[in-house]
């Protein structure tokens, strides 16, 4: 079994495209806001939180041209066929996370605890996001650094 290699990406100036406008897309965008990345949301509708964020919004169904210049792509729609098509349209050099199917992703997010002087990342290698979140919450409750 191949395991992932954890890294912390410097995203300043990088183009990130999130396809979808729901809760998962909102959570991904919130996590990216302070990275200096150029964030674009593509969705016919979006949550009120996404609508308030200082990001680019394209009110549209997904089209392949939406991901052409993206460094990172997040598939966050509630349509499996759309998510599958996005992963097929992605170029080999693009990093893509299909939030609905880990087998179509070439990276996964980690749960993080960030403080001014450290960043702690927790992962189940994309196998169990709920467990990852529970571990993070347990560490946050029991640790004072």
What is each model feature region?
Residues 1-45, 49-53, 57-61:
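Hydrophobic, well-ordered beta-alpha structural blocks that scaffold small-molecule cofactor pockets
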Residues 10, 113-145:
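Adenosine-phosphate binding glycine-rich loop
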Residues 40, 70-79, 118-127:
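Short beta-strand and adjoining strand-loop segment in the mid-core
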Residues 44-46, 62, 101-104, 125:
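Short, ordered loop/turn segments at secondary-structure junctions
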Residues 61-69:
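Short amphipathic alpha-helix with an adjacent loop that forms part of the alpha/beta core around
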Residues 65, 81-83:
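Short glycine-rich, flexible loops that bind phosphorylated cofactors or substrates
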Residues 72-76, 83-108:
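ADP-ribose/adenylate-binding Rossmann-like module
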């Amino acid at each position: 079994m191949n395991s992932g290699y954890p890294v912390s990406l410097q995203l300043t100036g990088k183009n990130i495209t999130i396809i979808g406008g729901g809760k998962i897309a909102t959570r991904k965008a919130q996590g990216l806001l302070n990275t200096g990345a150029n964030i674009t949301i593509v969705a016919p509708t979006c949550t009120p939180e996404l609508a308030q964020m200082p990001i680019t919004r394209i009110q549209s169904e997904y089209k392949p041209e939406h991901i052409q210049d993206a460094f990172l792509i997040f598939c966050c729609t509630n349509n499996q066929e759309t998510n599958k098509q996005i992963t097929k349209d992605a170029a080999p050099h693009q990093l893509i996370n299909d939030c609905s199917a880990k087998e179509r992703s070439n990276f996964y997010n980690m749960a993080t605890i960030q403080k001014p002087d450290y960043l702690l990342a927790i992962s189940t290698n994309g196998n169990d996001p709920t467990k990852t979140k529970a571990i993070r919450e347990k560490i946050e409750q029991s640790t004072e650094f």
